[in-house]
């Protein structure tokens, strides 16, 4: 869904920064779909950054807390994928992104959605919050952006997610069950995602979903 959004709204970018790039998995996919562009990755944890550098040696990486970013009008597009829910001062990070983007640059965000899906999984994952669509849009607009589009995803699986999370105890080891999908469940999940992406391409928007994607523009 991330690649689809970038192709739709910022296919002609030259400089792309991913905040909280982890081990570089998403940047690698971006590099595959948009070869020849300049890719940058910021990551707070050095261990993940080491893996990212091995995975994508042609990209530029920094060990950096997103709040400390001081770039000015440097990037055509910035992505933060399941990142800002971990940060207390998410408003400041969004402002940093606004400052770092060139005029007419795009911001791509994915976040976990709906506090009523909160469970021990979120606590184990060190989430500060799960967003509502309205909350995320308001914070993005307060940073100076214009929201271009927003939609829930992982929507077809919400009933299963809700049942699963109601059954989770507060035990850390049980929370890990959501992080370890069996191979057949992973295949099923990918099939559902393909269906949702197809529907999004046709113009559908989902009102609820386990996650939320938002695209915004710096005018």
Language-model region placement:
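A C-terminal cap/extension of S-adenosyl-L-methionine-dependent methyltransferases
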Residues: 71, 157-219
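A short glycine-rich, Lys/Arg-flanked "PGG" loop and its adjoining helix->strand segment in the class I
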Residues: 92-106
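Residues lining the SAM
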Residues: 81-84, 110
């Amino acid at each position: 869904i991330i690649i689809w959004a970038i192709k739709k709204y910022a296919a002609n970018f030259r400089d792309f920064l991913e905040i909280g790039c982890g081990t570089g998995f998403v940047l690698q996919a971006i590099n595959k779909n948009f070869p020849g562009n300049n890719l940058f990755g910021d990551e707070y944890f050095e261990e993940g950054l080491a893996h990212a550098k091995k995975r994508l040696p042609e990209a530029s990486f920094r060990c950096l807390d997103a709040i400390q970013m001081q770039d000015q009008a440097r990037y055509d597009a910035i992505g933060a994928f399941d990142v800002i829910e971990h940060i207390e001062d998410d408003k400041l990070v969004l402002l940093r992104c606004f400052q770092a983007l060139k005029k007419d640059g795009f911001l791509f965000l994915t976040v976990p959605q709906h506090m009523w899906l909160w469970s021990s999984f979120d606590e184990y994952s060190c989430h500060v919050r799960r967003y509502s669509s309205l909350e995320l849009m308001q914070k993005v607009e307060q940073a100076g952006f214009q929201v271009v589009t927003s939609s829930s995803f992982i929507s077809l699986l919400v009933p299963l997610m809700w049942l699963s999370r109601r059954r989770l105890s507060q035990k850390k080891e049980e929370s890990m069950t959501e992080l370890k999908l069996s191979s057949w469940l992973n295949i099923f999940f990918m099939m559902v995602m393909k269906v949702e992406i197809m529907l999004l391409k046709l113009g559908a928007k989902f009102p609820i979903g386990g996650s939320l994607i938002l695209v915004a523009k710096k005018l």
